[in-house]
Swiss-Prot record:
Cytoplasmic-side positions: 1-412, 471-494, 543-549, 663-1196
Region annotation (cNMP-binding domain) ranges: 745-845
Phylogenetic placement of the source organism: Eukaryota, Metazoa, Chordata, Craniata, Vertebrata
UniProt cross-references to Gene3D superfamilies, sorted A to Z: 1.10.1200.260, 1.10.287.70, Jelly Rolls, PAS domain
Name the UniProt record assigns to this protein: Voltage-gated inwardly rectifying potassium channel KCNH7
Any Pfam family the entry gives: cNMP_binding
Phosphoserine: residues carrying this PTM: 174, 238, 319, 896, 899
Motif residue range(s): Selectivity filter: 627-632
Amino acid sequence: MPVRRGHVAPQNTFLGTIIRKFEGQNKKFIIANARVQNCAIIYCNDGFCEMTGFSRPDVMQKPCTCDFLHGPETKRHDIAQIAQALLGSEERKVEVTYYHKNGSTFICNTHIIPVKNQEGVAMMFIINFEYVTDNENAATPERVNPILPIKTVNRKFFGFKFPGLRVLTYRKQSLPQEDPDVVVIDSSKHSDDSVAMKHFKSPTKESCSPSEADDTKALIQPSKCSPLVNISGPLDHSSPKRQWDRLYPDMLQSSSQLSHSRSRESLCSIRRASSVHDIEGFGVHPKNIFRDRHASEDNGRNVKGPFNHIKSSLLGSTSDSNLNKYSTINKIPQLTLNFSEVKTEKKNSSPPSSDKTIIAPKVKDRTHNVTEKVTQVLSLGADVLPEYKLQTPRINKFTILHYSPFKAVWDWLILLLVIYTAIFTPYSAAFLLNDREEQKRRECGYSCSPLNVVDLIVDIMFIIDILINFRTTYVNQNEEVVSDPAKIAIHYFKGWFLIDMVAAIPFDLLIFGSGSDETTTLIGLLKTARLLRLVRVARKLDRYSEYGAAVLMLLMCIFALIAHWLACIWYAIGNVERPYLTDKIGWLDSLGQQIGKRYNDSDSSSGPSIKDKYVTALYFTFSSLTSVGFGNVSPNTNSEKIFSICVMLIGSLMYASIFGNVSAIIQRLYSGTARYHMQMLRVKEFIRFHQIPNPLRQRLEEYFQHAWTYTNGIDMNMVLKGFPECLQADICLHLNQTLLQNCKAFRGASKGCLRALAMKFKTTHAPPGDTLVHCGDVLTALYFLSRGSIEILKDDIVVAILGKNDIFGEMVHLYAKPGKSNADVRALTYCDLHKIQREDLLEVLDMYPEFSDHFLTNLELTFNLRHESAKADLLRSQSMNDSEGDNCKLRRRKLSFESEGEKENSTNDPEDSADTIRHYQSSKRHFEEKKSRSSSFISSIDDEQKPLFSGIVDSSPGIGKASGLDFEETVPTSGRMHIDKRSHSCKDITDMRSWERENAHPQPEDSSPSALQRAAWGISETESDLTYGEVEQRLDLLQEQLNRLESQMTTDIQTILQLLQKQTTVVPPAYSMVTAGSEYQRPIIQLMRTSQPEASIKTDRSFSPSSQCPEFLDLEKSKLKSKESLSSGVHLNTASEDNLTSLLKQDSDLSLELHLRQRKTYVHPIRHPSLPDSSLSTVGIVGLHRHVSDPGLPGK
């Protein structure tokens, strides 16, 4: 029965603990995340903001190297040390000059403390900043006694009492203060000024380790860092300085000239890495600086890079145990090593040195937990800084969790003992404690009465319970589990300790031995203090207050317990008052007279038995609590009457509260039934008001009854909306978990994509016989069947039966608009379906394009409900309403499929592919029939609009080889063919019929009928693997072009009619020279590659009436005939076409020059302004210009 609250689930309280502890100590610190790029700052306290002048928004997400605090006086050496500490995940303290926001400088000690998880990987950095006062700056140590024991130095978070200890502490940050194995370098000379190292041979830029330079540079950008790498330790166990001497032999001669003083810059401790992970940080590739620096850790067994010569024993130890014992930092202020030139050879001779070097002979192997280091440095106590990980509450050895199974069992046991105490303590105090019982107990102790033994055991159990409460965790105000014994004791003392202690005191044992009446009465009263334990029962049972049945039982038990207590009090009043009554009118005397057991003063055992007394007292209290009493047991004395008044008053309150709650509880139990009848009444009223016929009425009632049984009248969507969106996504992900795991189309989706899909899914429950989709309904959703079976009927004929994990609907990505169902879908059994709306699915696919191709490739419909004629309906709707084209394009998606996916789709959906082939074959036959019976130009134009949907001829040989191209990719390619708009002239009109006849003959070049038909129909061998959706898209765009072509042709015909009607002067028309015979043996109508503005060409030759031939009289007659035929709705006759053809042959030599120009420039001619009716013809011919993207009619 424990309350499982607080720190039950594992959680990370690291940040909260750090912030809460540090804020009260006036610290100035930041916390950086070591797992993100540049170790970004994730928290800075108010002290840091006050110290630097920057606000928290200015500091957050900045690199923890604090580049914004750097300035001209900030030394690169200090910056490099901070960067090296961050790269190596090592603890270090550096004295740096920083700049306030207002530009002023300040000096502070920067303490970098890595916080690692249980695997030793640095998760965070705590960087503390502490001002350096002038006294600390001036206190430069003159000499440090190497033998001086340091045992009484109390460190308080970076502060030290003696300046002389600062240098020593810089060298051994994490060593215990009592550690005698300390390396101290005693220099012979000390000065306050640094001496230039004239003879010091600095490593060149080429000899510096590139990885180290890059690593350091990456952390101190944008400032440039020096390629020198400063370390404070050797690289080998046997001879720590031999590598240094071998690399720079001239350093031995120049060492005496170096300054041995510790300036502010050299005061910094240049500590080595504390583990293998830190050493690996030196050789990290620059590109991987901010990755997991410890992802390839192997505990020192395999270290790559320039540190291969280091022994595993050194790598496995810490910097405090093995590395500091070789420290020679006091010998040279700045040691610069070239890691790339370190060799594994060892020299036998040690380097000469004039200084006195004391190195401890033996160093212990120690492994300091980072948590302990941080705790020691920050002085926060033992359990202040937990490891950065998901962790269960830390408890001591003998501490009991308040939600543990043992505590739950113990609480139930104590609850039973409390109930026993509540019942037997008043009974024992009222009925059993008398002179005779006291005399028996003095003679034989507790062995005479078993009840006394039980009371003693209960007292012992309650004392043990008090001890357990001192070791039981509790939940504080921050919802955290407190396991500290001291805090638990304080919390228990402030709470229930006093009540539990009073209830557990065995008062009868404390005053055992005295046999007076006052003692007996006092023991009875003190034993009633055990009833205080009922308060614990109340706090334990509080969690069950929301259950109606539990509350009802609890109220009844309370009512009976109060009646029991009042019965004991009623008997105690009569028993105490009876010896002092002279008339014997008490209720006990009346009871003795009624049952024939009168009291005899000389016999103490006379009178009614204890059983008779208790039952009668309990009867009186129950009758008084529930009513005014029957009267057979009545109060006679004043004391009894006063008590009866109190019982009646308590009874009225108890009756009102208990039975009022009982009525509310009963009403709550039947609330579901009441809601059902209310909703059913609404359904029946709806049926009556709308006069719904009986079959449909029966279906409504049956569905309502089944739905109520299934959901108990609860609207699941309303319940789901009551939770935050994050919980809604998790709930939806759980509800659709089986579908998302079993369906092949959803495999491989990211977690975010699955959550988005789960939010869009709706669960539908259908009873048997319910029709889910009717024939002709718009398919607005995709259905996934998760339970049950359904049947699909066409004309009441079952065409398919679907079961679990089947999918039906339509391929939503292939169509711009939803289609119509071609069958009925009816449930055979109770079915659970997951459906997702078409728009919702497409929206998710748009948001996750990487998942879109996978989903659409692997989506396999068990049954496609889309009607076969839906494609034609879609094309017709688009052609009838061009204004909706943009809306349709919003739903068009460029879906690139691999060849395997296309083949899979074609094999998975044979019905669609067969329908497509049949549609192409029927359209092709229709095209051939139309071509064969082209009786007139107008009818041929109307007939050829259908086959021209794929008249985009690919003129380049390479384009046809590409497969799987979208139509958007084909349009620019086909644009190489230019539209030669020569329909302005009469010759172009008359050549339409001849083009049809001539086009049927094979051409010598590339215009064979088979090739042209394949190119025109778009069903060539190389493009046979196009998907149905891509063909649909091409059809849509081509239909739009045909519409524009039809309107343009109508305009051209109207303009021609106007020209024929208005032309009164016999003049030779400005014919296009490109209609000459021999030069045009290839298609002359081409698609323009680009939509260039059309320019008019002015001819140098102007025609005069004297140049006209006699044949123009025939031409005029033919024109008049054409005018009459066209105005009357009859097509152009063939006679006019023959006359025009012969006339053009005669006039070809006159327009040869213009023809050559037009061939070169591909510019369409207009009527020369010098000709008669030039203004009218120009206006009319301008209207003949087509859009450059319109497909032209192919001709010779």
